[in-house]
Amino acid sequence: MMFAQSLSNWLHRRGLHFSWVIVAVTFMTALSSSAALGLPGALLQPLSREFGWDVEQISSALAVRFALFGLMGPFAAILMERFGLRNVVVVALTLVASGMALATQMTQFWHLVLFWGVMLGVGSGLTALVLSAVVSNRWFDSHRGLVVGILTASSATGQLIFLPVGAWLVEHLGWRMAVVPVFVACAVMAVAVFLLMRNRPSDVGLRPYGALPGTEVLAAAPAMKVTLATPFRILAEAARNRVFWVLAGTFFICGLSTNGLIQTHFISLCGDAGLGPVPAASVLAMMGAFDLVGTIASGWLSDRYDNRKLLFIYYGLRGLSLLWLPYSEFTLYGLSVFAMFYGLDWIATVPPTVRLAGATFGKEKAGMVFGWIFAAHQLGAAVAAYGAGRVRTLLLTYNPALFAAGAACLLAAAMIWIIRKPAAASAVPPVQAKAA
């Protein structure tokens, strides 16, 4: 659109690159979407009280959301390739905003599954980590790890801003009013994306940020022919490489131990220990603050250090934190210690995982390959969202779920060493990088 071109020209005259506007818009988009994903975790008890649904029932609807959220990843990449970033993201934000708004009028359980399971799952899946991977690869030739770190940290920022506000609104004005800020944020961002988002740097006459001077500005055209079968073809190729299975397996555990368990059940878990929703949401916000720092730092580190070592540290630290949580006694001190150590690596696993996927499978395929890896992440989240709710219903405690997730994270830390050191990964064609 002319608005984006004019802004790009104005920035260029001042020595600024339009790619950072794309980063800002993507950051706010992911922030709004993540707020929509995180808010239902604060509404388990209010929904249970109003409609008589138990934790297991509500968790099953949220599990549908996580599953669709992840399964959209590979197809989000192809949709962005075929229809453009802007069109896909506008549709996605419209779905999320509509799902949030319609949920305020629900009266039946299937309404919850449709609005917060299907609509929220599909919409948020189109604006998930795959969007960050595509933006960083298309718009940047340098600082990709940092950009992925910044964009990934948006989910922590959304939690930091919206969860305490949402919990306060639930207590004072009811759960329906808690939905309003998230709906407004998604609606506003849909307009902003329509005005500012562009598909590639060449759309505004630019090279990717960091491209060498003299590099030709390439015409905006897909790098490879894509069809609906392309994600499955990419999956078949990636599945022959053990790096894919290690990254998918560890990311399954990542989703299981974060979105599915802590994001969904932490406020309910604290309620079992006698902690109200507002203090519990404040602890989640504290985790978000530490995660904001940890994820951006992880992006910076992933550009400079062995990403296997980073993932080993992140998964190990997370596993120990989860194993310790039941013994924290849920005091202010205990929860603060947990929030710090768990929060620092909540989503810090993403930049190293994206870097390893890109180094192994190449720039053009990295988006779709990471889409499948992210699908594993969200399937893990779905398993934990339902499984932890089931455990809570049957045993009246979340402790077995915490112990299982902690042990799984330690397993993920060990699995990382199956990957060979990618010393010259960027220079080795994907077919040669294939594991024996």
Model-derived regions, located:
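C-terminal transmembrane helical hairpin of 12-TM major facilitator-type secondary transporters
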Residues: P279, A285-D291, A297, S302-L356
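Conserved MFS/SLC helix-loop-helix module at the cytosolic interface between two early adjacent transmembrane helices
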Residues: L71-W110, S302, R308
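Extracytoplasmic gate region of multi-pass secondary transporters
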Residues: P40-L44, A236-T295, A384
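Helix-loop-helix hairpin linking two adjacent transmembrane segments in secondary transporters
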Residues: S154-V204
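Hydrophobic core of transmembrane alpha-helices in multi-pass small-molecule transporters
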Residues: L31, G99, H111-L126, F252, ...
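Interfacial helix-cap and linker-helix signal at transmembrane-aqueous boundaries
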Residues: L47-S48, L79-M80, I161, V165-L173, ...
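Cytoplasmic helix-loop-helix junction between adjacent transmembrane helices
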Residues: W116-A153
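Extracytoplasmic
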Residues: F18-V55, G73, L261-I267
